Amino acid sequence: MAGLKALAKETAIYGMSSIIGRFLNYLLVPIYTNALPVESGGYGIITNMYAITALLMVLLTYGMETGFFRFANKGVDDPMRVYSTTLLSVGATALLFLIVCLSFLHPIAGFLGYGEHPWYMGMMLIVVAMDAFQAIPFAYLRYKKRPVKFAALKLLFIFASIALNIAYFVGMKGENVGVAFAINLACTSLVMLCMWKELVGFRYVLDRELLRRMLHYSFPILILGIAGILNQVADKIIFPFVYPDKAEATIQLGIYGAASKIAMIMAMLTQAFRFAYEPFVFSKSKEKDSREMYAKAMKFFIIFTLLAFLAVMFYLDILRYILGRDYWVGLKVVPIVMAAEMFMGIYFNLSFWYKLIDETKWGAYFSLVGCSIIILINISLISVFGYMACAWA
């Protein structure tokens, strides 16, 4: 029970930072949905751009967060050597990615439909490269059981972002959607500066043999991560390419993206649980009663997520005021998206069996099947049912 109490304490800290952060982020939804008229498609651009960067984030971390936890807790390799190797690997690939993408910025932006505003894409490419690098120091904070600093840095980003967005979109009555991306870049840079202590005080070593083992372990998790993030963002990436009316696509995507934000309450709970549960599982894997603790953790997770689902459904008539009135037409997707997030949380909890026995290939198999179904449904049905096909997929 002591282990479960520690898990509950850390989940509460991670959860409060996540819940407070997401709640404060909700302030951006009424700001954007009132400052950016639905017919402008501005919120659709934001939805699409953040979906693309979410996928890139998974690609650029390529499962190394979980790999770091696994090898740091194994007791075979020096944890700081594992941290250094992970940091150098992810940092190098993020830098290479950024150089290549910025070299071909105009063709990439044109392909994605932002040929007239390539700087939108340029700013977000820099953001996602920095985010990928920061993911490893954040994982290190979780490994060292320092949830307070973890939460403080996350909240710093949120508060700075909200303050700047309010200043521009409310105070200055601005309507340039590109400023939202510039604000994200500024706030991400601020967090990077505040993370300097996690980047000094140790010897940087790239252990190639260790890296080879970590990549072998982490690659199937990358496939799992791609499938997991596609479950959340594939619809928002595919939608502009498949929807029959290209001009209307960003409008409809904006409505769907705004309404889906209400369902993100479930994502908050699953994310908070994940932040605490992942290091908890690996640290307790050698104890005799570990399976019993995992089962109890799953039971409480399901209970709390079901209560959250019911609470949102009961108070949806109040929660809808988070959105601008023109976006209310999309509220019918909320229960569907919330249920999907709950099932993803359950799947994440159950997926640890193959991570603990180093058989992560099974995660890749399951993920490829699920990902294929999601993409197929979106491509086949968006043109017929619009964003409702996205929700059901």
Which functions belong to the PLM regions below?
Residues E39-S40, L105-M124, T250, V312-M344, ...:
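Interfacial segments at transmembrane-helix termini and the short loops linking adjacent helices
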